[in-house]
């Protein structure tokens, strides 16, 4: 792939100076469409209740679930609402899951004066053997029992269950199904290799020198300032860069300053100011050479709730001079040369990880495709805007590349759907800790990591810059 294109390294590096320097034109993106309009907030009203988003989610998802249930259990299966259930009658019910979890953090429990409890310590996972699943529709709710994996499922998932209601007021599940992968438009065939670089978690302002070195080396590789002619030719095939959130370090939050007296902080400067200036300079170097899409993340200066709105251009006075810089939403979706990308900065996957038994980030990505929802745990355990007309997190169509940022390690996987869908799943690692980014080949949908964490003799077979698969 990318590393294989860097040819004749030793010859060009050790050759005498030449009067003519080779130049390589950037391989351009022929067609590009930003499809993130559903995630842009116009009117911002937080006076509405969150019940509306669950109601509209169920209304939008019900036709998909009914169709899927009839495919799985036969066209003659009875599909009923909870208020129509009869004890002992086998039928199918479509509803939204609520997962009752005794370990789930609760602000009401923490501030309770009656119990005088200590604050619950943070945990990596909040699942417990006593967790229960409750299915809700527009009118009623019922507890689920039987053949269903309680630990894996999360609140907000819309699914269809097959079984019967018992005399004890519980629903005995025999089988269940999700909406499945959405329909997918075929990708346009490409005759040449061109790459999209995925990077997340630059973590600027964290104080790590190695992270800054790796970031600058990454910029130099993409802009063609590093390596021999073969590597510069390879870098010219990077047609676009997507920065998937957490551009600033969590150390820049400076939340302790809120509790300090004003006279102690009058002449101090927020830790994020210098980090934003540094980010502006990095974006300036990148956008002068290649189109760049910048997604916000958990620690970046924008709204906390999903969908996160684009970073304000006034923070980047240098980089915004270039039209190649595009400040986008989180989640972000776009079509690049006929290949549909959809990705997040990782909050949705991290939240599902905490409240589910699923351990692998790629498994969670695939599971969200199966349930046809980007972030089912929002707004229960993950903040989101109180939508009421439509739920923008439902997959309208299946992407070709589906990624999440800020994962502990790199991972990629191609899955096939029942209707010939082909999806590349990518876990983009946190760059500040792994010094690793990802290259996606638009022609073949192959993915490889590109690492800047080590330099030495052991990297000779990977090109000295970690440009290996």
UniProtKB/Swiss-Prot annotation:
Question: Quick check: keyword Nucleus in the entry?
Answer: yes
Highest taxon, organism lineage: Eukaryota
Gene Ontology CC: one annotated term: delta DNA polymerase complex
For the modification N-acetylmethionine, which residues carry it? Answer: 1
Q: Which GO terms describe its biological process?
A: DNA biosynthetic process; DNA repair; DNA strand elongation involved in DNA replication
Statement: the UniProt record of this protein carries the keyword Flavoprotein: no
| Entry keywords, A to Z | Acetylation, DNA damage, DNA excision, DNA repair, DNA replication, Nucleus, Phosphoprotein
Subcellular location(s) of the protein? Nucleus
Q: State how it assembles.
A: Component of both the DNA polymerase delta and DNA polymerase zeta complexes. Component of the tetrameric DNA polymerase delta complex (Pol-delta4), which consists of POLD1/p125, POLD2/p50, POLD3/p66/p68 and POLD4/p12, with POLD1 bearing DNA polymerase and 3' to 5' proofreading exonuclease activities. Within Pol-delta4, directly interacts with POLD1, POLD3 and POLD4. Following stress caused by DNA damaging agents or by replication stress, POLD4 is degraded and Pol-delta4 is converted into a trimeric form of the complex (Pol-delta3), which consists of POLD1, POLD2 and POLD3.
Q: Which GO molecular-function terms appear in the entry?
A: DNA binding
Output this protein's name.
DNA polymerase delta subunit 2
To which protein family does this belong? Belongs to the DNA polymerase delta/II small subunit family.
Q: What is its main location?
A: nucleus
Q: How is it modified after translation?
A: The N-terminus is blocked most probably through acetylation, as has been shown for the human ortholog.
Instruction: Using the record's annotations, give every residue carrying the modification Phosphoserine.
Output: 15, 257
Q: Which gene encodes it?
A: POLD2
Among Pfam families, the record links this protein to: DNA_pol_D_N (PF18018), DNA_pol_E_B (PF04042)
Q: What does this protein do?
A: Accessory component of both the DNA polymerase delta complex and the DNA polymerase zeta complex. As a component of the trimeric and tetrameric DNA polymerase delta complexes (Pol-delta3 and Pol-delta4, respectively), plays a role in high fidelity genome replication, including in lagging strand synthesis, and repair. Pol-delta3 and Pol-delta4 are characterized by the absence or the presence of POLD4. They exhibit differences in catalytic activity. Most notably, Pol-delta3 shows higher proofreading activity than Pol-delta4.
